[in-house]
Structure formats: C-alpha cells, structure tokens
C-alpha cells in the first residue's frame, strides 16, 4: 500500500531560456525546408548558354527543379519581359554614338550596318561590339528579301547599284547568324551551331538589358555576288572601317564592289580565274578591293565618278590620289587601269558606300529601336 500513500511529486515546468539562446531555435522553426543544392557544373552550363549573373542562374535552376532546358526558358521569358520594359523606358533617349560594323564573307558577300547607342563608353563595350558584329555577319550572310526593289543611286555609274539596302524591319525578325571567327580554308560559310535560335531583335534587347542604353539599328546594306557566277565577269567586294579595335568596326566605314572582266574579248574571265595563276589573281583582287574601301574611308568620298554632279575633287573616288595604295600620288582611276593592264583584266568600281556615325540620316522612319 506504499504506492497509495506516497505523496504526489510536484509538477516540474521547463526552465525558461534567455531570449538570446531561444532565437536560433525560433529561427529554425520559422525557416522553411532548405532549397535543394544547385550543382556548380549546372550553373556553369546554364551561364555558358545564357550569360547572366550567378545569382540569377542559380534562381532559374532552383525554380525549374534543376532542369537545364526549363531554366533556359525561364531566363528567356524573364529577361525578355524585363528588357522590353526597359526598352520602352529609354526609347526616347538620343542615340548619337555607336559603330559602323562590316562583315566580309568568303570574298563573295559583304554587309555593313550602323548600330547606334547613347554614349561612346557603351560603343566601346564588349557586349555592344559583339552585338554589332553579329548583326553585320547576319546582314552579309542573308539575302535581301526578294520583294525589295533594287535602287539606282547617283554614286554608281551603272544602271543598278549592286549594293542593296537591307530593310531593318526584316533584319530584326531574322535569326542571328553566328559565324566562325575567320573564313575556313575552303571558303565555306557555315553558321556555328547554337542551342536556341535568337532573332536580331532579341539580341538587341539582351544588349540593352546589359548596357542600360537605348540601342537602334539605323541602317544596313549588303552585297552578294551572283550565284552561279557568269563566265564574263567577277564581282569582288571589299570593306574597311576606321576608329575601332579592328578594321571591321569603327566610327567610319566603307564598302566597295569591283567588277573584273577580261581585257581579251575572246578569253572570258572565268578561264583566267580557273587557269594558271587564277588563285593569285583572285587574292590580289580581294586585297585591292580592301585598299579601295580604305581609300573611300580615308577621304570624304561621296561618288565614284563625277558625271555631271557638282562635287569637289576629293569627293570623287576615281579622281582622288590613291594614297592608300602605297602612298601613290596617281589617281585611283589611273592606278586601277595599270593594275588591270598588268594582269590582262579590266577593273571597275561598280558599287560604293561610306558611312560615319555622325551622319545625318534623312529617312528617320528607317531607324529601328531595340
């Protein structure tokens, strides 16, 4: 009966903890389950395909359950929406700086574009440079839409200027073409494989999001040699830009198109090109085309031939001293004539464009915001 007579023990309450000691426990109770750990290798793979800050890449992978494809979709959607909003906010800002970018492909195609931004600081930014180069490569690689009428302009002495305006609205919706850093040995122009097609507009929006400035694709032109080529004439494009890191982009840029025909009516140029020394002739013509483009940029060139136009001597390409050809004091016309005579061919400059960042562009509606 001892159990019945034993006095009941006092109820023991838990000892109070100091507030400082209790906080960690309270935080643990209030904190949700830890998010799954994101592998560093997966973050690196995502950033390689879609360059974003580290934290943004980690967030995208967490939200997509570590699914790389889903994370890419998440980033594209969120980045595009954010960039569109920012583009609308900065669209009214002046774009007086930028670059003229040129892309020459395989000695058969050339493209030139004018991409504008707000400040010279951004114009020298690597993101902006890469964007301008990509747009220029795309312009050179793609054909101008077939319904775009060939214009006739005063700077060409021929019926049609072979250099065509490329509508900026068409370029914006075109896929961005990524090409090798240099032409391949066989002259092929195969685009590099990409994980996901990106339009030029999306590329501009991405650059806008990274630079924070208003970007505009102001103008674009391109030339593509006829394919298949005719036996009687070869067209050779050339390009040069001044004031940039390379001779493919700068504050001033110019492109030209040379026609090369045989001096012997009985011997078409095709037989010369495919005969002994033909490769050397083609390489020499390509080098000369670049030199002529450099001449166009180095002088305030406006027209190829004077014709009946009231222009200064230094503005007429064929009348300028060909200073870019080893400092030659003879006119461009005379040098080209002698160059061709030595090789049994006739050279003509049949197309030309010279652009500068500071040009006043008359047709403002052709400016295209990012």
From Swiss-Prot:
Transit peptide: 1-29
One GO term describing the cellular component: mitochondrion
Coiled coil: none
SUPFAM superfamilies cross-referenced by the UniProt entry: Elongation factor Ts (EF-Ts), dimerisation domain, UBA-like
Single annotated GO MF: translation elongation factor activity
HAMAP family: EF_Ts (MF_00050)
UniProt-recorded name of the protein: Elongation factor Ts, mitochondrial
Predominant localisation class: mitochondrion
Organism annotation: Cryptococcus neoformans var. neoformans serotype D (strain JEC21 / ATCC MYA-565) (Filobasidiella neoformans)
Gene that this polypeptide is encoded by: TSF1
Location of the protein in the cell: Mitochondrion
Family in the record: Belongs to the EF-Ts family.
Function summary: Associates with the EF-Tu.GDP complex and induces the exchange of GDP to GTP. It remains bound to the aminoacyl-tRNA.EF-Tu.GTP complex up to the GTP hydrolysis stage on the ribosome.
Key words of the record: Elongation factor, Mitochondrion, Protein biosynthesis, Transit peptide
One GO BP: mitochondrial translational elongation
Pfam families on file: EF_TS
């Amino acid at each position: 009966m001892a159990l019945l007579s034993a006095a009941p023990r006092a109820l023991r309450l838990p000892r109070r903890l100091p507030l400082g000691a209790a906080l960690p426990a309270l935080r643990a109770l209030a904190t949700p389950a830890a998010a799954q750990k994101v592998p560093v290798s997966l973050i690196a793979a995502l950033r390689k395909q879609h360059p974003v800050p580290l934290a943004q890449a980690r967030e995208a992978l967490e939200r997509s359950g570590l699914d790389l494809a889903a994370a890419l979709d998440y980033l594209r959607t969120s980045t595009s929406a954010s960039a569109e909003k920012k583009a609308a906010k900065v669209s009214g800002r002046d774009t007086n700086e930028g670059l003229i970018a040129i892309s020459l492909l395989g000695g058969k195609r050339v493209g030139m574009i004018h991409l504008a931004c707000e400040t010279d600081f951004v114009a020298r930014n690597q993101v902006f440079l890469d964007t301008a180069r990509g747009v220029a490569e795309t312009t050179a690689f793609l054909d101008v839409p077939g319904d775009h009428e060939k214009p006739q302009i005063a700077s060409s002495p021929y019926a049609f200027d072979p250099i065509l305006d490329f509508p900026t609205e068409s370029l914006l919706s075109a896929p961005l073409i990524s090409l090798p850093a240099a032409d391949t040995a066989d002259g092929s122009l195969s685009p590099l494989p990409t994980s996901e097609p990106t339009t030029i507009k999306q590329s501009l929006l991405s650059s806008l999001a990274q630079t924070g400035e208003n970007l505009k694709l102001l103008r674009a032109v391109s030339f593509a040699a006829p394919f298949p080529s005719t036996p009687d004439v070869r067209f050779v494009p050339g390009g040069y830009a001044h004031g940039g890191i390379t001779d493919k982009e700068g504050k001033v840029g110019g492109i030209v198109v040379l026609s090369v025909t045989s001096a012997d009516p009985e011997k078409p140029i095709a037989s010369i090109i495919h005969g002994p020394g033909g490769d050397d002739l083609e390489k020499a013509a390509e080098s000369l085309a670049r030199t002529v483009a450099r001449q166009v940029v180095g002088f305030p060139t406006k027209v190829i031939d004077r014709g009946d136009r009231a222009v200064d001597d230094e503005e007429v390409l064929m009348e300028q001293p060909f200073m870019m050809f080893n400092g030659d004091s003879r006119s461009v016309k005379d040098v080209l004539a002698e160059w061709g005579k030595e090789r049994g061919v006739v050279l003509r400059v049949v197309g030309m464009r010279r652009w500068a960042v500071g040009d006043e562009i008359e047709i403002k509606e052709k400016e295209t915001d990012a």
